[in-house]
Every structure is written in C-alpha cells, then in structure tokens.
Amino acid sequence: MNQTPDQARPTPRAGIMDIDAYVPGKSAAPAGVAKVYKLSSNENPLGPSPKAIEAAREVAARLDIYPDGTARRLREAIAEVHGLTAQNIICSNGSDEILGLLAQTYLAPGDEAIFTEHAFMVYKIYIQSAGAAPIAVKETDERADIDAMLAAVTPRTKIVFLANPNNPTGTYVPFQEVRRLHAGLPRHVLLVLDAAYAEYVRRNDYEAGIELVRSAENVVMTRTFSKIGLGGARIGWMYAPMHIVDAINRVRGPFNVNATAIEAGIAAIRDRAHVERSVTHNETWLTWLSQEMTGLGLRVTPSVGNFLLIHFPDDQKHSAAAADDYLTARGYILRRVSGYGFPNALRMTVGTEEANRGVVAALTTFLKS
C-alpha cells in the first residue's frame, strides 16, 4: 500500500503540536550536593498531616479493591469542613484535572477563553487542547486587571479563568472586584475561580468564591489538597452548580481519585490543627523572607500565597539565571519563571526555617560577589 509521508504514522489533530508542554519545577541538585532543599513547587514544608499518613497506611491492605467512584466520603468531609453541600462537589486527580475537564466540556473550536498574562500555565494548555483560542489579558502591577478582562470578552468567549490568588505572582483580587467581574460577564460565560492557595490568605477583603457559586449559575470554584501537604496524592475538588456537576460527571474518569488519596484526604482536611500550623508557619516566614529579600535590594511581588516572586538586577552577573545556578549548586532548588513572562525572576516556596535562612544567606553572598 502506497502512503504519503503524512500517512506513515498516526498524527495528532490540528493544533496539538502547537501546545507548549508544561514543565514542572526541578527537584534535583547536581551530583555531590549533600542536602537538597526543594523550594520549586509550592509544597507544604511541614509535610502531610500525621493523621493522613496513618490513613494512607491503613488502606494499603485493601488496594485490590476499586475506590468509590464518587469519592462520597471525601466529598462529605470537604462539605463538613467548609459548610457546603456534598452533592455540589466533585473530587479529582489534582485540581488541574478539573480545569481540563471544564475546558473539554465547555469549549469547542472557534471559542475563546480568557486568563491573565501571568496566570497558571495549564489554562492555556487546556484551552488549546479543546481547540479553542487562548486570550491572555495584560495585568496591572502584576495583578489581574478586571477592566481589561471585561474588555477582552467577545461573543466567542465561553470561559474566564481567574487564579485568585495567582501563581506565580502571589497577588490576589479583592472579592468586590471578583463580583464586578462576574456582573460584567454574559450569563452563558463560565467564570472559573481557581482558589488553590485560599487556605493561606488572611485578608478581610478576600473570599475563595463559595458565596458566589451559591448565588450564580455560571461560577465554579476549584481547590486543592496540595497546599495542605498532599501534593503527591493528587487531590483536587470543585464546588459548582448542579448542572455543571452533572456535565463534568459525564466526562470524568470513573475512578479518578484513588483509594489512598480518598482516605488520606479525609484525614487531612479534618485535621484542622495541622492546617492551622501550616498557615501560621507560612505567615511567619513569608513576612520574614519578604523583609530579608527587600533588605538585599531585591524587589519582591507582595504575596498572599506560600511563595514569593523575587526579581533580580538587570546585570548579567546577578541575574535570576545566575542566582538560580548559584543556589542550585548549593542545594537550594527554586523555580525559574521565564515561561510565565518573568525572565529575570525566581519563585521561591516558603520552606522550613533551615531552608529559608539558607537561601537568604546564600543570596547575600551571591549578591556581594
């Protein structure tokens, strides 16, 4: 059978190879580095709740049994803690799975979806995967600009993604502004509030989105267990109106949350003492790191997350790339963020006291060199 070169093997549909693959933060230092401090992925420096660890151990003997495909007990635990209705919750293999399912379900070729220019990179990936057009809106002072987002809405707009707080900047939108964004959207446009870092925010003008979801038919809120110590378990969840829950349940995998994740998640979200310890640790060291970095002459974007965006001088000797190489050689792994539009900045997760002090000491020496 004669074939043209294009027919010699399966090929992805149009547009797939135009997608830039997501590259996670690195996790290894060069060979010979005695101790590695991974500060590149916004993980919880206190680790998992001891109760979650024990719950994961207990389920090990039952791993031959499929998990509950609805994750009912996990949904009930989430509902109990947050004062929600369990039937309005869907659990997922990380919150990014939910983001992908929303794009898959509500976008089609020819549609548009909006996000801000420095937002979580997976939005663009999932929008393109659905065959839709990604529309990146300029930010103002590294914050979402609500007027600019509303101005970007066209008859083709179907989804607006808002990371609140945003990664990698750590900035947030006061909830009155979120409500203004929602009020300005056509009712058929879905507003996705990605509140992955909500646990860490202690501001009177911030809300994760629960009340807006309750009162609207076109708003969902997504959350994650990663920031409370279960990044490796991959647990996300969405709170949404029932008509959206129904649609997503039709396309999600039948056993998308595994048995270990379900049991660990139930224990973790009910261990409020561990969550509060995590938040207190973060508040203390986020403030300290911000002050120390500023004292070194580095600009820091004000953050309410569990990380800092640190901006470096323009001179090549003390650039972000040079700083990253210097820190990595000493076992401190930070995140380069060129792909987010910050070629001369590094994102640093708030770590343990030892890690935080070590990075500041290393940068002090680096900047004097």
From Swiss-Prot:
N6-(pyridoxal phosphate)lysine: residues bearing it: K227
Reaction catalysis annotation: L-histidinol phosphate + 2-oxoglutarate = 3-(imidazol-4-yl)-2-oxopropyl phosphate + L-glutamate
Family annotation (InterPro entries): Aminotransferase_I/II_large, HisP_aminotrans, HistidinolP_aminotransfase, PyrdxlP-dep_Trfase, PyrdxlP-dep_Trfase_major, PyrdxlP-dep_Trfase_small
Annotated keywords: Amino-acid biosynthesis, Aminotransferase, Histidine biosynthesis, Pyridoxal phosphate, Transferase
Known cofactor(s): pyridoxal 5'-phosphate
Record-level GO BP terms: L-histidine biosynthetic process
Enzyme class: transferase
Gene3D superfamilies noted in UniProt: Aspartate Aminotransferase, domain 1, Type I PLP-dependent aspartate aminotransferase-like (Major domain)
Transmembrane intervals: none
Protein origin, superkingdom: Bacteria
Molecular-function GO terms, alphabetical: histidinol-phosphate transaminase activity; pyridoxal phosphate binding
Pathway: Amino-acid biosynthesis; L-histidine biosynthesis; L-histidine from 5-phospho-alpha-D-ribose 1-diphosphate: step 7/9
Pfam families linked: Aminotran_1_2
EC number(s) per entry: 2.6.1.9
UniProt record similarity statement: Belongs to the class-II pyridoxal-phosphate-dependent aminotransferase family. Histidinol-phosphate aminotransferase subfamily.
Subunit structure, interactors included: Homodimer.
Name under which the protein is recorded: Histidinol-phosphate aminotransferase 2
